[in-house]
Amino acid sequence: GTAIIVLAGVLNALKVVGKRLEDVKIVQNGPGAAGTAIIKMLQVAGAKNIVAVDEHGILYPGRPAGLADHKEWLATVTNPEHLTGTLADAVRGADIFIGTSVAGALTTEMAATMAPDAIVFAMANPNPEIMPDAAKAAGVRVIGTGRSDFPNQVNNVLAFPGIFKGALSVRARDINPQMKMAAAKAIAGLIPEDELNEENILPKAFDPRVAPAVADAVAQAARES
């Protein structure tokens, strides 16, 4: 669920800053279940340069600190520039930071080394990897968190129940990547281009348009895939 909302947010944030998904460098901090799903989703959508970082630093094949189970695979499908080092090394020059890690993981100093017009999704709960005011002070253009008291809340409720409704309506046996992509694009598309801005990249959690739009898009994708 989170991966779908993150992709929707990323698509709209990229429009705000005028960059393309296939061109940007993305750092994903905390590649557990949610983080890994986000990486897969972004790659399906066309992201080419994703660097995954865990508590031992950047993931790369044969890392001395070791790679648990799924991270072995992640190391082979991410990090095309073969970076090594820490989170600070990874975020230098990055266009997007996506955190599913711990509070305070992204310092203001690190955020300041990101590329111009940087985008940050800091989703550690209850306290994000970096607070929105600190991110803005560091020059970040767009910041989303998991919290409802800040703009751009990444909330799973945007994906469900629309996805299930759409899948059930066409008796889909599973929810495939095409259906997830369709859901993300439907969510992103609910914000008209002229209303998109740094503080408005995702619909609100209880926007009544969300579930029907997602259900329709998912059903359509299920029929086509």
Q: Which residues are covered by each model-predicted region?
A:
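Conserved structured core elements
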Residues: I4, G32, E81-T84, A88-V91, ...
